[in-house]
């Protein structure tokens, strides 16, 4: 087994054995992967995990390894790690290897939709931007249409902007794949592929022929318009991917919670859908949100991009300021709250009366 695939399997095993502190949804996502490795271990199985494939020039590659190695040749673009090469953490390798490693007999990906829910600060945009560049230039798709989509222009440009900066800081990437970086899009003339940011504000979203559609922060979408457009647009290709990565929110009647509910039922084995990947980082029911272990449990990038010296004081502030609790729980513990209104700890109120 390759280094990346082995790392992904080891992460899953450590999660399932409770060596790594995670919530039930991460445990179930890892258990699903481990079960699938057994279920589809025969070469005649419906799916193969990270097999050796041949490109159009007869060169061999393994899909999970190819993606992970590609991403680790790209730079960070923000914060203290800016300009340093990305080093994927085990949880990221697990997600990437699982989504991209499973293929059908024709080499096309098993997973057509991916839902990743994780608290703020866990390098969501960095991961999505890097995957977007891969899908633009290295996924062996002619005329690939890659989009970062959102309800607003500013939100849509976050992932695209990070990818744009990555490309500008990576002359090796631009030269290897002949990528042209413009102000509003990136394109590869040789393959007719492009990467753009699109929003529901002033953009015509109908009729898109999407190879990779990235929806960042789906919880902020008040309607299902963008999601439905991407789901329809990716249906026009046979190796496309709808990639959703988001934090929790408050709208339990919206499209994000609908997709989340679908994923939780899938992870609970209520039904099977071999085209959907899902993983949700957060807390379990009954966990004490004021405990430090809860911060570690909910944030897979703890100690890397999520720093104790920043998050612990925010937790302490929320413990003393009821109006800050909802925001803290949602953004930093990935907990869906019932409303945007301030949360009131009635026990604290009574105790201080």
Language model segments and positions:
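Phosphate/NTP-binding elements of NTP-utilizing enzymes
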Residues: 1-353
């Amino acid at each position: 087994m390759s280094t990346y695939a082995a790392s992904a399997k080891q992460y899953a095993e450590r999660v399932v054995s409770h060596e790594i502190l995670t919530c039930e949804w991460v445990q179930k996502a890892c258990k699903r992967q481990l079960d699938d490795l057994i279920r589809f271990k025969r070469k005649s199985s419906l799916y193969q995990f990270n097999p050796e494939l041949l490109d159009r020039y007869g060169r061999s590659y393994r899909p999970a390894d190819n993606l992970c190695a590609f991403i680790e040749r790209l730079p960070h673009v923000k914060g203290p790690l800016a300009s340093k090469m990305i080093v994927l953490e085990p949880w990221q390798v697990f997600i990437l290897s699982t989504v991209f490693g499973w293929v059908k007999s024709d080499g096309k990906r098993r997973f057509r939709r991916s839902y990743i829910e994780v608290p703020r600060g866990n390098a969501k945009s960095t991961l999505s931007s890097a995957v977007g560049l891969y899908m633009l230039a290295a996924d062996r798709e002619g005329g690939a249409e890659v989009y970062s989509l959102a309800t607003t222009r500013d939100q849509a440009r976050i992932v695209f902007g990070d990818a744009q900066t990555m490309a500008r800081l990576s002359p090796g990437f631009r030269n290897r794949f002949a990528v042209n970086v413009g102000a509003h899009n990136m394109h590869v003339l040789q393959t007719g592929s492009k990467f753009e940011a699109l929003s529901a504000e002033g953009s015509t979203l109908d009729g898109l022929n999407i190879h990779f559609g990235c929806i960042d922060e789906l919880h902020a979408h008040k309607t299902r318009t963008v999601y439905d457009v991407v789901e329809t647009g990716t249906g026009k290709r046979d190796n496309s991917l709808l990639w959703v990565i988001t934090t929790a929110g408050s709208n339990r009647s919206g499209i994000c919670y609908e997709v989340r509910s679908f994923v939780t039922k899938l992870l609970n084995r209520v039904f099977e859908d071999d085209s959907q990947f899902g993983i949700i980082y957060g807390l379990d029911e009954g966990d004490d949100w004021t405990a430090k272990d809860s911060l570690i449990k909910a944030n897979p990038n703890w100690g890397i991009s999520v720093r104790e010296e920043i998050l612990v004081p925010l937790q302490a502030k929320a413990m003393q300021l009821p109006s800050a609790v909802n925001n803290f729980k949602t953004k930093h513990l990935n907990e869906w709250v019932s409303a945007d209104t301030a949360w009131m700890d009635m026990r604290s109120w009574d105790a201080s009366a």
